[in-house]
C-alpha cells in the first residue's frame, strides 16, 4: 500500500481565538483522497466531543421574552451571547459558572467565574451591558456532548421554572473544506492524488488535535472489520423420529434374522434406516427371506428403505 505523508502547511488564530489549520495529505492512490476526505469531514463535523452552554439562570427572570431593568440587552440577546461562547470543559459532569456584577459595566465572558476545569476560549466575548445603579446575576450551566442537542420542551416541566434551556452546539469544529489535486507521475504510471484539508475550530481544540481524534474514531470504526472471519455454520442434525428409536426387539423378527442383524451391530430401527435391500443381503447368513421379513416389519411402522444403495 502506498505510504503517504501529512503536513500542516498553514495555521492561523483569529481575533475570536478560533483556529484554522490547512493540511496536505499525499501521495494517495486514485480515489483514496475522496474516501479519506469525506470520512474525515463527516467525523470532524459531527463526531467529536465538545463543550457548550446548555442552560442559563438570570435572577428575577423566568422566561426568555422578558427584559431586565438597567440592562441594554434583552434576555434573548443574553442567551444568544452565552450560546456563542467557546468553552472547553474537562469535567464530564455539568459545570456551573456564576456572575454577580454591578453597573455601569460591560460584562464579558472573562467575568464569569468557573472552576479550574473550565476554560473560556474567547474571554472578550460580550455578554451584556449594565447601566449605573443596576446589577446582573447569572448562573451558566456547561456540559460536554457530541453534535447538536435541541431543547426538549417535554422535559422543561421537570426543570426549575427560572432555568432557561438553550439549544446546545457541542461541535468544536466549525468548518471543514477539502480539495483534491492530481500529482505528476512518471509516464505510464498510475495517477496519484493529493488531499488538501482546511479545518476551522472554535478554539477549544486545535485543528491538529481534531484531525487526530477524527482519525482515531475511524480506526476504531474499521478495526473490527480487519478481524472478520467467516464461520461455517454446522447444520443441526434433525432429531430422530419416534419410529426410528424403536429397538430391534420390538420388530418381532425371526430368531435367525434377529441374530444376524445383532451380529451386524444393528440395534434399532434407526440403524436399519441406513441400509438398502442390497445391503441387507450382504449381511452374513442373511438371505432374501430374512431381508423380505425386515422390509415387511419396517413397512408396518411406516418406514421404507431403498432397494439398492445410493451411488456416490
From Swiss-Prot:
Self-association and partners: In cyanobacteria the RNAP catalytic core is composed of 2 alpha, 1 beta, 1 beta', 1 gamma and 1 omega subunit. When a sigma factor is associated with the core the holoenzyme is formed, which can initiate transcription.
Protein name from the UniProt record: DNA-directed RNA polymerase subunit alpha
Alphabetized Gene3D superfamilies for the sequence: 5' to 3' exonuclease, C-terminal subdomain, DNA-directed RNA polymerase, insert domain, RNA polymerase, RBP11-like subunit
General function of this protein: DNA-dependent RNA polymerase catalyzes the transcription of DNA into RNA using the four ribonucleoside triphosphates as substrates.
Domain description: The N-terminal domain is essential for RNAP assembly and basal transcription, whereas the C-terminal domain is involved in interaction with transcriptional regulators and with upstream promoter elements.
Pfam hit, one: RNA_pol_A_bac
An example molecular function term from Gene Ontology annotations: DNA-directed RNA polymerase activity
Amino acid at each position: 500500500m502506498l505510504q503517504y505523508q501529512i503536513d500542516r502547511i498553514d495555521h492561523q488564530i483569529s481575533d475570536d481565538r478560533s483556529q484554522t489549520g490547512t493540511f496536505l495529505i499525499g501521495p494517495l492512490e486514485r480515489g483514496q483522497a475522496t474516501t479519506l476526505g469525506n470520512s474525515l469531514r463527516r467525523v470532524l463535523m459531527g463526531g467529536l466531543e465538545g463543550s457548550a452552554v446548555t442552560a442559563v439562570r438570570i435572577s428575577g427572570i423566568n422566561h426568555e421574552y422578558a427584559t431586565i431593568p438597567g440592562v441594554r440587552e434583552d434576555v434573548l440577546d443574553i442567551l444568544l451571547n452565552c450560546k456563542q461562547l467557546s468553552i472547553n470543559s474537562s469535567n464530564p459532569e455539568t459545570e456551573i459558572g456564576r456572575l454577580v456584577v454591578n453597573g455601569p459595566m460591560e460584562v464579558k465572558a472573562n467575568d464569569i467565574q468557573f472552576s479550574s476545569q473550565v476554560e473560556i476560549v474567547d474571554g472578550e466575548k460580550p455578554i451584556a451591558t449594565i447601566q449605573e445603579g443596576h446589577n446582573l446575576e447569572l448562573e451558566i450551566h456547561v456540559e460536554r456532548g457530541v453534535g447538536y442537542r435541541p431543547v426538549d420542551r417535554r422535559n422543561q416541566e421537570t426543570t426549575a421554572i427560572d432555568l432557561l434551556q438553550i439549544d446546545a452546539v457541542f461541535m468544536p469544529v466549525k468548518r471543514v473544506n477539502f480539495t483534491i489535486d492530481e500529482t505528476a507521475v512518471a509516464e505510464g504510471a498510475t495517477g496519484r492524488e493529493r488531499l488538501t484539508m482546511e479545518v476551522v475550530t472554535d478554539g477549544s481544540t486545535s485543528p491538529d488535535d481534531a484531525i487526530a481524534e477524527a482519525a482515531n474514531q475511524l480506526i476504531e470504526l474499521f478495526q473490527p472489520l480487519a478481524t472478520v472471519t467467516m464461520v461455517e455454520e454446522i447444520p443441526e442434525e434433525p432429531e430422530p423420529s419416534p419410529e426410528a428409536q424403536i429397538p430391534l426387539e420390538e420388530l418381532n423378527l425371526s430368531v435367525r434374522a434377529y441374530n444376524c442383524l445383532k451380529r451386524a451391530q444393528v440395534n434399532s430401527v434407526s440403524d436399519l434406516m441406513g441400509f438398502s435391500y442390497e445391503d441387507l443381503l450382504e449381511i452374513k447368513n442373511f438371505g432374501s427371506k430374512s431381508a423380505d421379513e425386515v422390509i415387511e416389519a419396517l413397512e408396518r411402522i411406516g418406514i421404507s428403505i431403498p432397494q439398492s444403495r445410493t451411488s456416490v
